Design a protein with these regions (language model features):
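N-terminal subdomain of nucleotide-sugar transferases
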Residues: 3-50, 84-86, 104-117
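Structural motif corresponding to alpha-helix initiation and N-cap regions
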Residues: 73-80, 99-102, 172
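A short, charged, and often flexible helix/loop element on the N-terminal side
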Residues: 49-81, 93, 154-167
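Short N-terminal targeting/anchoring amphipathic segment
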Residues: 81-100, 113-120, 184
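Membrane-proximal helix-turn-helix segments that form the acceptor-binding/catalytic region
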Residues: 110, 123, 136-184
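Glycine/Thr-rich phosphate-binding loops of Rossmann-like dinucleotide-binding domains
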Residues: 21-22, 101, 125-126
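Short, compositionally biased "basic patch" segments
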Residues: 38-55, 134-147
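Short aromatic-enriched loop/helix-cap "lid" or pocket-rim segments at secondary-structure transitions
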Residues: 26, 55-60, 104, 127-132, ...
Length: 185
């Protein structure tokens, strides 16, 4: 006799993969965790993007992706449509920076689905995600004053890129995106 296992929970798992070949703990955790959830009877729908998309983008594509870090209309729309179609019980967000953007959090909340997030790094207190300046521990942005990273060019050793990233995180801190749009960490 064959007895079909009931699905315990339907989970929409969202992740922004790093570039192929980069050693990324959060990429591995995402893969392992979603596989484990499925092994235990959950249905997992994956919505992922990869930073490899930057490599294939021309100048216009890279500019568009830069503005998309603040708010990705494409990913907001895609996540809303996926939630509408699949009707998950919960949305589990792993890494959303840079391509997915916090817009996906708003898409999930607007759809009425609970959002949980796994923090794989210190990105919410250090937009560079490492809490390091060179090899030294740094907590200058820990109080939410992300503009300090501009002084040191923390993001990719570039003051301009640091300014862009700091602006994005300041905007989302003002909107309380990481507090109001996520139900549990």
């Amino acid at each position: 006799i064959y007895v079909e296992k009931a699905v315990i929970m339907k989970i929409l798992a969202i992740h922004n993969f790093h570039r192929k070949g980069s050693a990324s703990g959060d990429d591995q955790v995402f893969k392992s965790e979603t596989a484990l959830l499925e092994e235990h009877g959950n249905q997992v729908i994956r919505y992922t993007v990869s930073n490899d998309e930057f490599d294939d983008a021309g100048v216009i594509g890279k500019l568009s992706a830069t503005f998309g870090m603040l708010w990705s209309f494409k990913n907001y729309r895609n996540v809303r449509q996926l939630i509408e179609k699949e009707k998950p019980d919960i949305v589990h967000v792993h890494t959303f920076f840079p391509l997915l953007s916090p817009s996906i959090l708003y898409a999930a909340k607007k759809s009425g689905v609970k959002v949980v997030a796994t923090l794989h790094d210190t990105r919410f207190v250090c937009p560079c995600s490492t809490s390091l300046r060179g090899t030294e521990l740094c907590n200058e942005c820990g109080d939410g004053k992300y503009y300090r990273m501009c002084k040191y060019g923390c993001f990719k050793n570039s003051k301009l890129q640091s300014f862009i990233v700091a602006s994005i995180f300041i905007y989302h801190r003002i909107r309380k995106s990481f507090y109001k749009q996520i139900d549990h960490y």
